[in-house]
Amino acid sequence: MAGLSHPEGMLRPDDFVAIKANWLPKDKNIVDTAEELNILSEAFVFVDDNPAEREIVSGQLGGTAVPEIGEVTDYIRVLDRSGYFETVTLSEDDLKRNDMYRANAQRAKAQSRFADYHDYLLSLEMTAEIGDFSPLYLQRITQLTNKSNQFNLTTKRYTAEQMEAVYNSDEYIRLYGKLYDKFGDNGVVAVTIGKTDSEDKGRLDIELWLMSCRVLKRDMELAMLDSLVAQAKKRGIREIYGHYYPTAKNKMVAGLYESFGFEKISQDEEGNTAWRLLVEGYEDKNTVIKVKEEHYA
């Protein structure tokens, strides 16, 4: 830590979202930090001049990037050419990422003070902004479709052009979700795209449902479902169909539609499932987030 306080140094402790300066195994520190920030260990790049430490982390955390940095004179060159920190697009949410990670650490600390999880959620004083797609957020929405893997039921990816086409089409019910709480703004964290059936006007098929890992377990998915059903009712939709396509990373949402009250109507040999929800009689499920709807009449 002393090195970060050197008067001629460029970095300060506040430049880091988390600092682990202890004698614990480094793979354990990576796992602990990932849990604190609510991200995957696959999001980390581990840089160490000790080959033994690099081998341990590589063996314990297969998804963590561990570059072979070699000689001291090669450090900057290896990291610069690795591509780990390249980005094709930079959204407004990206610029706030460090602040968002710090806020997540504060939430984790606050949660430890509650025995009842529902009470903890209420204490966050959450407000969601949910509405139709806006040009202001299209870049972030497209980015999410190509990054989110855990809470992503179909893992369908979209290019900017494809998302623009969805935005300009009347065939779709489109929802983005932003989540705020007393610790800060989480940004755009949820996306749902449902396509109406040209032959059966009472049917809506969910083509995409995803949520950023930074807001998992905060009931944002319930708020999104309530808003989706509300918009479906306005369109005269009677049935909403959802699909789950399993991948190595999205097992956490395998039972999502069932938990929402959807009826399973099919399953193939690969585990792909289809689900149906009758809109009539649906009761709102969100009880902890105040929702402010935007851009919908």
Residue positions per predicted region:
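Extended, hydrophobic alpha-helical segments in both membrane/secreted and soluble proteins
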Residues: 1, 30, 46, 53-54, ...
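Substrate-recognition/cap helix-loop segment adjacent to the acidic, metal-dependent catalytic center
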Residues: 1-21
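Glycine- and acidic
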Residues: 13-18, 205-214, 238-243
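Conserved Lys-Pro-Asp/Glu-containing loop-to-beta segment of HAD-superfamily phosphomonoesterases
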Residues: 30-51, 57
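Terminal substrate-recognition subdomain of acyl/acetyltransferases
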Residues: 36, 58, 62-124, 230-297
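Short, high-confidence coil segments that cap the C-terminus of an alpha-helix
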Residues: 39-41, 171-172, 234-237
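A conserved beta-strand-loop-helix scaffold within acyl/acetyltransferase catalytic domains
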Residues: 129-214
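Conserved acetyl-CoA-binding loop-helix of GNAT-fold acetyltransferases
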Residues: 216-230
